[in-house]
Amino acid sequence: MKTAMGLLLAIAATAVQADNLVVNVNLGGSASEQSAAFGVTHLEKGAFSDTFNFSPSAGTYAVDASLVTLGFSPRTDVTFTAAYVNGHELTLSGPGLFEYGFLLPAVITGPLALTVFGYVDFEDTSLTPASASYAGTLNISAVPEPGGYALLLAGLGVVAAAGLKRRRQGA
């Protein structure tokens, strides 16, 4: 009896869990600006937590991101509940047929990971699977290190000092 009850609880628990995904995404572009597109399809009803790891991503970047989903039937509808890039929260639209999310440019130190929380929910109690998807983009621009700014200021100071010295010698 205990085994049967435990088996039923295990089946019930898995019935409301969607597939949680971890996806590695390669950024492409130049050394100063890179971008990537990503997307997933959830085939199970329930809550999900998806993580996208972006590479290469060591360094400090100005990062912006977007998410979008469009589902006209309940089986194809994803509802976003939260999304974060390294703890920076994306602004999400409300639940509906068309949902989106975005992160305005923010300075973030890598490695970069986007975590998306949401759910696929529909009333049908049959074993028909879901087929709900969403997609997005992540863009990065290199941000100079503070040491780079210090070198720039030091260089400008040397140029200014040389200009003053010439000016005094010419007078």
Predicted regions and their residues:
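Mature extracellular "passenger" or substrate-interacting domains of secreted, surface-exposed proteins
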Residues: 19-142
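Intrinsically disordered, low-complexity segments used for protein-protein interactions
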Residues: 99, 165-166
